[in-house]
From Swiss-Prot:
Annotated family: Belongs to the betacoronaviruses spike protein family.
Subcellular locations according to the entry: Virion membrane; Host endoplasmic reticulum-Golgi intermediate compartment membrane; Host cell membrane
Transmembrane segments: 1297-1317
Span of the signal peptide: 1-17
Name recorded for this polypeptide: Spike glycoprotein
Extracellular domain ranges by topology: 18-1296
Protein's organism: Middle East respiratory syndrome-related coronavirus (isolate United Kingdom/H123990006/2012)
GO terms, biological process: endocytosis involved in viral entry into host cell; fusion of virus membrane with host endosome membrane; fusion of virus membrane with host plasma membrane; membrane fusion; positive regulation of viral entry into host cell; receptor-mediated virion attachment to host cell
Record site: Cleavage: R751, S752, R887, S888
Length: 1353
């Protein structure tokens, strides 16, 4: 074979607008084509193997040497089988060729998407069967495929698919495989018999006749082109390029892609003929987007005796992928890895290495993908599209508009009525516009020819966008061009297409012409003067404008386009999104599982009245205004939603899952571990995993499918019951990934698949090798004495609170820097939010800590408790007033009384007055108080009479007795003096008590104020210690001097020294560096905050177990056995002092695990919380005793310290001196465990706490404050007010004689009235029994009455 290379030969004449591609075919009919698809359906797989560089397009414009890189570009999928195509010889009778024999490739239109690559001649030079004659074998020859590519495709006149509209790119091999022809023309179907626009059409095809076209040295270079022209006339061709190919049978690759620069052709023949790397060899000036392609059928018209087999070719779609490429020293790609093929590929790409050692590698973390959907939208009537489905559609300049609100639309149903030729959108995808919700939907429709499609494009400056119709791109818009099918008879065709090609205004001088351009979403100004249809090209219309309209003339001219066979229309769709709920939604049927309530806790896609996204819904407490539906945070993130079901749901982001790859280099096997996640979660979130992983999850293979383990969900591992002692692929939780090697000791015959990886358990059978015990005895050291000690421990429970003004820290007030900082988005907000979250975490941690460890409030102590408690302050003060403390109820009724204050002498006075006449003993009963005689200030009537008589007598007798009778007035005067003394004494006591109350109350207030002040000062010390952030910020502040590559750390210096552009670059370096430093600082704070929170939990446990109780855990509350613990507050934490005792002396004893009766081996006992021991001092053989485990205190073995157990080989058999529990035969008694006498016979001294005074507490010294608090408590206790007793004395005043006389007379009169009323008002009914009335009253006349019979009911 001769090495070949492309020779680029351009057969294009650039001076012409269209190129000459030769004359049309002169044949009146096309060769009949026979389609027998079953003959061509073969299974000859040729999957992509990127490890051999299959289908690799070399990076454009650069080269590499001896390097491995990851590269993002267009590549085929690893393992892609592609689409297989094969050409065949045609029908022949002897030496006469007949019908063409092809597959149905012309109607099999594919999406072009990102392009494709083609494997050509893979089976060349081998032996295969002839397609048309499967029983015939022949040498397989290489043949090149032909392609048809375009932007618009539809049906031929008979309804068969495969017609390309507008300009179409054709890649046509010719010259018996020695050249490739590329041309870009409008393909006009020919109307002859068997032609696309004629009768009996089945398919178009190309062909060549080897006998005449491929004779040695005389190849027909136009054989295939001429055959193609039999089916299509080539019109308006913009170019035709021809590329020569040297004939060979070597496997080669061909590729085609499209960018804004045009269509690019690639081939491995250009540079790397034998390696397979494709290099670009041509760029075709095709700028319309290629959307579709099809394979042009080709048939070889060989004679029947000379039929050959032709190699199949394979087309593989290109995808935007990431590949790991390995470049050789000479610069070619010799192997590659598709990074998205499987998890092992991801591992290689993550480490950019083709050689990875065995191990368990973390590759990435995948965010959970939605496992369902949630949809809520307005329910309304269906949008009415009927106006556009009836009548004659208007011309483009007179388009009709439908505006929809508050309705449900079905755009898919509407478009299904038409044959859509073109669907382009701006700011939205075609799929999204048919599935989203909007506040309004605007639909414009008009008749429009597809041949003028480009005039409606965004960048067009033609008459359509200038004077007829123009869409506004401020909102999402779509433009649809479609053909009305024949069966849609409700729409009638206009006679022709017409449009305005000119619209201008001439000013009043008739010389100045101003074009009147159409505004977006508005009608043309000339629509009022142009009729609904323009009849002839160049029709001219004019209208004189009124002065109000500015004067002058409005002129327009029109153009027409011939009506097509089928009406073609244009649809312009514009949608608007509302600020809240959107009422125009697609007409969809929702299942029950699309409700929020059915998807709680799951990662779902949601669409809520036009607001869509992804997240997890949970029930929450309602916030915000219900009528507004949506609740947002300060960063405009949706955080809550009021559902139609009446509930409020909060929304959070979906979680992420860490992924690891388990790889064994020896066997080249791997498995995937999804850490700490349930398998049901990963199976519903597959879309982001590798393609192989997704395939396994969909297949749900019971052997290699998801396997739940304690470390997460694994794929590619087979569960087994194997145990291994040495594991090179440990997974954690004593699990091991075991590759298929001879070390598994698993016979190959029982393995399901060679090369599998198994899940095994790690068995630590012999971690420590020890000698076998020779007897059931063992020696033991038990403490016999203890010494006390103190363990000091500090636990940090919080960190310094830190807040940073991000903008001030980064920019220091420079406006230029702050402007650039805005380009970093919400970085500063996130920083502050993270720091605030850390501070709140600290507050919650400290609050929870102290809420858990604080002492609960004590209940009041009531009288009656025994002991040495002084409860007198809490008891009510009792006042004794003598034996007669009160009068009887009758006395209270019969006498007037008054209660007065008693300074202390009233009771003595009252007792004295009871011994004789009150009027005579008043002065005798005067009491002494503080040296003064006092009497009560009240006097009864008798005293008043006696003193008044004495006073009057003394006054009246003065003249008769020469003044001697005045002595009779002395009692009266003394009574007045003594009573005034009593009033004064009472007032003095009241005044003294008032002073005591005021002083003691002020003393109590002062004590409480001092206590609060002291407590406040202590809290200030704690707060100062906790919030001391100088050390935390020192590192952050030091970074302000770092230049981070800028010319200076001072922004002001940079602004002063540099121009504007250089300032931006230098300041941006400082911003980037300082933000990085700030981000690292925040990350450190978050870690420290979480660590402190965990320590706070430990401190809470220690307070609850060590301070509030006595711990039984060894080493948890200090060293040794715990006795008591103390805790004090310390900066950023708590300071513990644990008091415990440590063993100081031990004794070595012989012990046994258990004891059994040698005569009855099933009768065995074991110690409870202790040991069976036999000391060296034991003189009697087999004499055993019991001791506790913490202190040596031998005691007899009884049922209280033992329990019956099953016999064990380590138990000691004894035959003599059996302890009591072994003397009985019953072993089924259920003994209740009791506490051992732990401190029995403990000999030790009183704990010495002297060392506690040496603890350095200067960091947080609260001694003075605690003493002050004690003084405050003492002062409060002393504030009890010991008031001088002021008793209550009740004075009774007896009534005078005339009151008693009137009282008695009243009682007698009342008795007489009652007697007369009862005795004299009837006979036989009085209180006197059966006495007659004449015995107590006058006689009444008697009347004789006849008796009457009376019935009493």
């Amino acid at each position: 074979m001769i090495h070949s290379v492309f020779l680029l030969m351009f057969l294009l004449t650039p001076t012409e607008s269209y190129v000459d591609v030769g004359p049309d075919s002169v044949k009146s009919a096309c060769i009949e084509v026979d389609i027998q698809q079953t003959f061509f359906d073969k299974t000859w797989p040729r999957p992509i193997d990127v490890s051999k560089a299959d289908g690799i397009i070399y990076p454009q414009g650069r080269t590499y040497s001896n390097i491995t890189i990851t590269y993002q570009g267009l590549f085929p999928y690893q393992g892609d089988h592609g689409d297989m195509y094969v050409y065949s010889a045609g029908h022949a009778t002897g030496t006469t060729p007949q019908k063409l024999f092809v597959a149905n490739y012309s109607q099999d239109v594919k999406q072009f998407a990102n392009g494709f690559v083609v494997r050509i001649g893979a089976a060349a030079n081998s032996t295969g069967t002839v397609i048309i004659s499967p029983s015939t074998s022949a040498t397989i020859r290489k043949i090149y495929p032909a392609f048809m590519l375009g932007s618009s495709v539809g049906n031929f006149s008979d309804g068969k698919m495969g017609r390309f509209f507008n300009h179409t790119l054709v890649l046509l091999p010719d010259g018996c495989g020695t050249l490739l022809r590329a041309f870009y023309c409008i393909l006009e179907p020919r109307s002859g018999n068997h032609c696309p626009a004629g009768n009996s059409y089945t398919s178009f095809a190309t062909y060549h006749t080897p006998a005449t076209d491929c004779s040695d040295g005389n190849y027909n270079r136009n054989a295939s082109l001429n055959s193609f022209k039999e089916y299509f006339n080539l019109r308006n061709c913009t170019f035709m390029y021809t590329y020569n190919i040297t004939e060979d049978e070597i496997l080669e690759w061909f590729g085609i892609t499209q960018t804004a620069q045009g269509v690019h052709l690639f081939s491995s023949r250009y540079v790397d003929l034998y390696g397979g790397n494709m290099f670009q060899f041509a760029t075709l000036p095709v700028y319309d987007t290629i959307k579709y392609y099809s394979i042009i059928p080709h048939s070889i018209r060989s004679i029947q005796s000379d039929r050959k087999a032709w190699a199949a070719f394979y087309v593989y779609k290109l995808q935007p992928l990431t590949f790991l490429l390995d470049f050789s020293v000479d610069g070619y790609i010799r192997r590659a890895i598709d990074c998205g093929f499987n998890d092992l590929s991801q591992l290689h790409c993550s480490y950019e290495s083709f050689d990875v050692e065995s191990g368990v590698y973390s590759v990435s973390s995948f965010e959970a993908k939605p496992s369902g959907s949630v949809v809520e939208q307005a329910e309304g009537v269906e949008c009415d599209f009927s106006p556009l489905l009836s009548g004659t559609p208007p011309q483009v300049y007179n388009f009709k508009r439908l505006v929809f609100t508050n309705c449900n639309y079905n755009l898919t149903k509407l478009l299904s009525l038409f044959s859509v030729n073109d669907f382009t959108c701006s700011q939205i995808s075609p799929a999204a516009i048919a599935s989203n919700c909007y506040s309004s939907l605007i639909l414009d429709y008009f008749s429009y020819p597809l041949s003028m499609k480009s005039d409606l494009s965004v960048s067009s400056a033609g008459p359509i966008s200038q004077f007829n119709y123009k869409q506004s791109f401020s909102n999402p818009t779509c433009l649809i061009l479609a053909t009305v099918p024949h069966n849609l008879t409700t729409i009638t065709k206009p006679l022709k297409y017409s449009y305005i090609n000119k619209c201008s205004r001439f000013l009043s001088d008739d010389r100045t012409e101003v074009p009147q351009l159409v505004n977006a979403n508005q009608y043309s100004p000339c629509v009022s003067i142009v009729p609904s249809t323009v009849w002839e090209d160049g029709d001219y219309y004019r209208k004189q404008l009124s002065p109000l309209e500015g004067g002058g003339w409005l002129v327009a001219s029109g153009s027409t386009v011939a009506m097509t066979e089928q009406l073609q229309m244009g649809f312009g769709i514009t949608v608007q999104y509302g600020t809240d709920t959107n009422s125009v939604c697609p007409k969809l049927e929702f299942a029950n599982d699309t409700k929020i309530a059915s998807q709680l806790g799951n990662c779902v896609e949601y669409s809520l009245y036009g607001v869509s996204g992804r997240g997890v819904f949970q029930n929450c407490t309602a916030v915000g205004v219900r009528q507004q539906r949506f609740v947002y945070d300060a960063y405009q993130n949706l955080v809550g939603y009021y559902s139609d079901d009446g509930n409020y749901y909060c929304l959070r982001a979906c979680v992420s899952v860490p992924v690891s790859v388990i790889y064994d280099k020896e066997t080249k096997t791997h498995a995937t571990l999804f850490g700490s996640v349930a398998c049901e979660h990963i199976s519903s979130t597959m879309s982001q995993y590798s393609r192989s992983t997704r395939s396994m999850l969909k297949r749900r293979d019971s052997t290699y499918g998801p396997l739940q383990t304690p470390v997460g969900c694994v794929l590619g591992l087979v569960n087994s019951s194997l145990f291994v002692e040495d594991c090179k692929l440990p997974l954690g939780q004593s699990l091991c990934a075991l590759p298929d090697t001879p070390s598994t000791l698993t016979p190959r015959s029982v393995r399901s698949v060679p090369g599998e990886m198994r899940l095994a358990s790690i068995a630590f059978n012999h971690p420590i090798q020890v000698d076998q015990l020779n007897s059931s005895y063992f020696k033991l050291s038990i403490p016999t004495n203890f010494s006390f000690g103190v363990t000091q421990e500090y636990i940090q429970t919080t960190i310094q609170k830190v807040t940073v003004d991000c903008k001030q820290y980064v920019c220091n007030g420079f406006q230029k820097c702050e402007q650039l900082l805005r380009e970093y988005g919400q970085f500063c907000s996130k920083i502050n939010q993270a720091l605030h979250g850390a501070n709140l975490r600290q507050d919650d941690s400290v609050r929870n800590l102290f809420a858990s460890v604080k002492s609960s409030q004590s209940s009041p102590i009531i009288p009656g408790f025994g002991g040495d408690f002084n409860l007198t302050l809490l008891e009510p003060v009792s006042i004794s007033t003598g034996s007669r403390s009160a009068r009887s109820a009758i006395e209270d009724l019969l006498f007037d009384k008054v209660t007065i204050a008693d300074p202390g002498y009233m009771q003595g006075y009252d007792d004295c007055m009871q011994q004789g006449p009150a009027s005579a003993r008043d002065l005798i009963c005067a009491q002494y108080v503080a040296g003064y005689k006092v009497l009560p200030p009240l006097m009864d009537v008798n005293m008043e009479a006696a003193y008044t008589s004495s006073l009057l007598g003394s006054i009246a007798g003065v003249g008769w007795t020469a003044g001697l009778s005045s002595f009779a007035a002395i009692p009266f005067a003394q009574s007045i003096f003594y009573r005034l003394n009593g009033v004064g004494i009472t007032q003095q006591v009241l005044s003294e008590n008032q002073k005591l109350i005021a002083n003691k109350f002020n003393q109590a207030l002062g004590a409480m104020q001092t206590g609060f002040t002291t407590t406040n000062e202590a809290f200030h010390k704690v707060q100062d210690a906790v919030n001391n952030n100088a050390q935390a910020l020192s590192k952050l502040a030091s970074e302000l001097s770092n230049t981070f590559g800028a010319i200076s750390a001072s922004i002001g210096d940079i602004i002063q020294r540099l121009d504007v552009l250089e300032q931006d670059a230098q300041i941006d370096r400082l911003i980037n560096g300082r933000l990085t430093t700030l981000n690292a600082f925040v990350a450190q704070q978050l870690v420290r905050s979480e660590s402190a929170a965990l320590s706070a939990q430990l401190a809470k446990d220690k307070v609850n177990e060590c301070v509030k109780a006595q711990s039984k855990r060894s080493g948890f509350c200090g060293q040794g056995t715990h006795i008591v613990s103390f805790v004090v507050n310390a900066p950023n934490g708590l300071y513990f002092m644990h008091v415990g005792y440590y063993p100081s002396n031990h004794i070595e004893v012989v012990s046994a695990y258990g004891l059994c009766d040698a005569a009855n081996p099933t009768n065995c006992i074991a110690p409870v919380n202790g040991y069976f021991i036999k000391t060296n001092n034991t003189r009697i053989v087999d004499e055993w005793s019991y001791t506790g485990s913490s202190f040596y205190a031998p005691e007899p073995i009884t049922s209280l310290n033992t329990k019956y157990v099953a016999p064990q080989v380590t138990y000691q058999n004894i035959s003599t001196n059996l302890p009591p529990p072994l003397l009985g035969n019953s072993t089924g008694i259920d003994f209740q465990d009791e506490l051992d006498e732990f401190f029995k016979n403990v000999s030790t001294s009183i704990p010495n706490f002297g060392s506690l005074t040496q603890i350095n507490t200067t960091l947080l010294d609260l001694t003075y404050e605690m003493l002050s608090l004690q003084q405050v408590v003492k002062a409060l206790n002393e504030s009890y007010i010991d008031l001088k007793e002021l008793g209550n004395y009740t004075y009774y005043n007896k009534w005078p004689w005339y009151i008693w006389l009137g009282f008695i007379a009243g009682l007698v009169a009342l008795a007489l009235c009652v007697f007369f009323i009862l005795c004299c008002t009837g006979c036989g009914t009085n209180c006197m029994g059966k006495l007659k009335c004449n015995r107590c009253c006058d006689r009444y006349e008697e009347y004789d009455l006849e008796p009457h019979k009376v019935h009493v009911h």
